[in-house]
Regions:
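Domain-core and long-helix interface of multi-subunit machines
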Residues: 1-11, 41, 77-165, 169, ...
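An N-terminally biased module of ancient metal coordination in phosphate/nucleic-acid-related enzymes
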Residues: 1-69, 92, 118, 161, ...
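Residue-level recognition of short, well-ordered coil/turn positions
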Residues: 27, 53, 100, 148, ...
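A residue-level signal for beta-strand positions that form part of recognition/binding surfaces
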Residues: 56, 72, 167
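Active-site segment of extracytoplasmic enzymes that catalyze sulfate/phosphate-ester chemistry
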Residues: 70-76
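C-terminal functional module detector
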Residues: 147-150, 160-290
Length: 290
């Protein structure tokens, strides 16, 4: 587990909390889109079936697949996991083989969107709650309109308070085949689309770093031993006082700089693959200079 700097833990919301919140919000159906796995779907089905109060909620299988360029594609209606790391055409072929529906997730997000290749998907996510830079959603909406694509909104929820932040309404029977067919017939509409709050993004960051601390430190120890003490001190400092003034200022600064990068990439034509290239020099330059 020491060969990758990627954070392994992404969401700490329990299945129980998600289902009871769906019940309270009177949500009829959920697609569970965990990263590169169907395990969350299977676990949620098991929990729901063991609690009579929750059985009215329909739960359908889906996956958020990471392709070879680190972009994300949603697959709705699959029953076998689609492996990550394939190129976009291989991934879409694998989705079609299961008679499922593909959707470009947050396509113009700078770090993990597939950008104009979204045209290859059945649908496009034109509003993502975590795109608080605004530009990513604006460009996605325009791209969808220009290319007459089917649009949906996604909560992309990683903390409990953002669950149901976006809701789509579909004119169909509450059965998987009917839902997929009617989505492709443009019988869906975005019923609710609201952005995550800055505090919710900070909460997500805290969970990821706290849950993944050992993994990150092990990676640094193996690959960058000279930086281990500094990284450990920084993590310990943040995790012990995440709500301190210092970390709130740094968090707000990080969001501001990421918004500047998104504006340059999405509105001014700068290199859209800056995160893929992992060039921190370029990133810092883009965020700081006009």
């Amino acid at each position: 587990m020491n060969d990758s700097p990627r954070i392994p833990f992404d969401c700490g919301v329990t299945i129980e909390d998600q289902l009871y919140l769906a019940y309270e919000k009177k949500i009829d159906a959920l697609f569970i889109t965990n990263h590169n796995t169907l395990n969350g779907y299977k676990q949620m089905i098991e929990y729901r079936d063991n609690h009579e109060k929750l059985r009215r909620i329909k739960i359908y299988p889906a996956e958020e697949i990471t392709i070879n360029t680190k972009g994300h594609i949603l697959a709705y209606g699959i029953y076998e996991t689609i492996k990550p790391g394939m190129d976009i055409d291989e991934t879409l072929d694998a989705i079609k083989k299961q008679n499922a529906v593909s959707c470009a997730a947050h396509p113009f997000a700078v770090s993990n969107g597939i950008r104009e290749k979204a045209i290859k998907c059945d649908m496009i996510e034109t509003f993502n709650s975590n795109n608080i830079d605004h530009y990513s959603n604006l460009v996605a909406e325009k791209f969808s309109s220009d290319n007459h694509m089917i649009s949906i909104a996604g909560s992309d929820s990683h903390v409990l308070t953002t669950f149901g932040r976006c809701i789509n309404s579909i004119e169909s029977e509450n059965k998987l085949d009917s839902i997929l067919q009617e989505m492709l017939k443009r019988k869906s509409k975005i019923l609710k689309a609201e952005l995550a709050l800055k505090e919710e993004l900070f909460e997500h960051a805290y969970y990821m770093l706290s849950a993944s601390k050992d993994h990150l430190l092990n990676y640094i120890l193996v690959h960058h031993p000279s930086k281990f003490s500094l990284v450990k001190w920084t993590l310990d400092s943040f995790l012990s006082k995440p709500n301190s003034k210092l970390w709130k200022i740094l968090g707000s600064l990080g969001l501001y700089l990421s918004k500047r990068v998104s504006k340059k990439v999405n509105m001014k034509g700068h290199n859209p693959y800056v995160f893929q290239d992992r060039s921190w020099k370029t990133l810092i330059s883009m965020s700081l200079y006009p």
